[in-house]
UniProtKB/Swiss-Prot annotation:
UniProt EC number: 2.1.1.228
Function text: Specifically methylates guanosine-37 in various tRNAs.
PANTHER family listed in its UniProt record: TRNA (GUANINE-N(1)-)-METHYLTRANSFERASE
CDD domains documented for this protein: TrmD-like
Broadest EC class assigned to this enzyme: transferase
Quaternary data: Homodimer.
Family as reported in the entry's similarity comment: Belongs to the RNA methyltransferase TrmD family.
Name of the protein this chain belongs to: tRNA (guanine-N(1)-)-methyltransferase
GO (cellular component) term, any one: cytosol
Keywords per UniProt: Cytoplasm, Methyltransferase, S-adenosyl-L-methionine, Transferase, tRNA processing
UniProt xrefs under InterPro entries: Alpha/beta_knot_MTases, tRNA_m1G_MeTrfase_C_sf, tRNA_m1G_MeTrfase_TrmD, tRNA_m1G_MTases_N, tRNA_MeTrfase_TRMD/TRM10
Source organism (scientific name): Microcystis aeruginosa (strain NIES-843 / IAM M-2473)
GO biological process, one term: tRNA N1-guanine methylation
Residues holding S-adenosyl-L-methionine: G112, L132, G133, D134, F135, V136, L137
Length: 231
């Protein structure tokens, strides 16, 4: 998987890409990350990539020329997706991460800034707009990093035990069940006895019921969708 990141702040990614599973995946060439400094495609001495919006308004917009030129400079590795990080995009979800990991060779991630980007970028270049949720961040680098992390961990060879990916939240349409480790009693709080019983069927039944209860309580939207899929 090739990730090309169009950003004003390449250094933002330095530490996360050198840590944990992401670093190992890059070392093994499971994934590749190419950081593209948008200012390298500015054409004035100040390396300016933003300007005032037509019609007035607060703040600045990223200009179309540097973004188009930055992406046109990249090697094309189809199938690819050109993604803009924006609060106006569709919410990022696990199914989308799985689609990217399983069906795409290249993700080009445009990190938004200021008040956004010239709409012509969205209309004629971007293939998908994505948001982390109903809130606003100072930059698009944070959601871009979330996508890199979320997709890479789904690529074969990244996670040691592939089976663990099948048992986590959202894979069965439900949230994950609660988990415990040693000690069996901590400050008077006890691990549920069923988990120490050794009865695998009882444990499986308990975990499934916990998934149902937790999803219904915490994420009624997911719960309703799950119910509809059972019909």
């Amino acid at each position: 998987m090739q990730f090309d990141i169009i950003t004003l702040f390449p250094d933002f990614f330095t530490s996360p890409l050198q840590s944990g599973l992401l670093a190992k995946a890059l070392e093994r060439d499971i994934a590749r990350v190419n950081l593209v400094n948008l200012r390298d495609f500015a054409h004035d001495k100040h390396r300016r990539v933003d300007d005032e919006p037509y019609g007035g308004g607060v703040g600045m917009l990223l200009k179309p020329e540097p973004i188009f030129e930055a992406i046109e400079s990249l090697e094309i590795l189809p199938p690819r997706e050109i993604v803009l990080m924006t609060p106006q995009g569709e919410p990022l979800h696990q199914a989308l991460l799985k689609t990217w990991a399983g069906s795409y060779q290249q993700l080009i991630l445009i990190c938004g800034h200021y008040e956004g980007v010239d709409e012509r970028v969205c209309e004629h270049l971007v293939t998908r707009e994505v948001s982390l949720g109903d809130f606003v961040l100072t930059c698009g680098e944070i959601p871009a990093l979330a996508i890199i992390n979320g997709v890479t961990r789904l690529l074969p060879g990244t996670v040691g035990k592939a089976e663990s990916l099948k048992l986590e939240s959202f894979e069965a349409g439900l949230l994950d069940y609660p988990q415990y480790t040693r000690p069996p009693v901590f400050r008077g709080w006890q691990v549920p006895p069923v988990l120490r019983s050794g009865n695998h069927q009882d444990i499986a039944d308990w975990r499934y019921q916990q998934q149902l209860d937790r999803t219904k309580e915490r994420r009624p939207d997911i719960w309703q969708k799950w119910l509809e899929e059972q019909d």
